[in-house]
Amino acid sequence: GWCALLVLLAVATQGSLAQSPIYGNIAEEDYLIGKFDATMHDGIFTQITSIPTNYPMWFRRDALNAFERLYKDMMVANPSLPTNLPIVSALRNLTYQGGIWDRKWQGEYHNISNPVLRGLGILEYSAMPGTSRHHWGTDLDFYSLENSDFDHGIGKIIYTWMTVNAYKYGFCQPYTAGRCAGYNEERWHWSYIPVSGGLRHAWNRVYGDTTICKWASKVDFSGAKSVGIMASAYVNTINPSCL
């Protein structure tokens, strides 16, 4: 079945990932937490130009090639769709994710005095810097950042087709409804499992529960000491089909 296919695709990248050219010349410890500038590593990453984006974005070349095929086939299968459906977000490095987090910490969640509760509020939809799947250049947000937009019209056509067909191109929705913990449902978020599956295992090996202090020493963001202990749970509580 398709679950088995995704597992086999992911396993292919897990073996000796630390020595793999998957990181290019970026140190594994840095790659896994997004501590790099994608524009300086065009052997791995490329700017997205073939599909509309809301601003200049970069993505892994292998993941983009797969998504381009998906995008093209989705358009052919659904001729009523507009031809300018956008990628809303793609690769976000550590600095970029830190900006998102700190703006929310100081902004819309500022009135929550308890730092743990403030962090949990942000974590409903935004990752701690150093834990986001967007760091890896394998995950993108597509069309809209509102779940309700996928209940009707264009969004419903997209989501219905994606849930049936995305796995054929290596993509999986990591944040589905009904999971026991972690981020809220994100119908817009899709991950290229042939690469991200191995990267999640690598993150656990390098920065998992037993080495969380190592992760904490490499990231710096508001509330890190209060919510950092939860990092592993948010990295790993995903759709079982994406494991």
How should these model regions be labeled?
Residues 3-12:
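Bacterial N-terminal signal peptides
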Residues 15-243:
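Extracytoplasmic cell-surface/polysaccharide-interacting catalytic and binding patches
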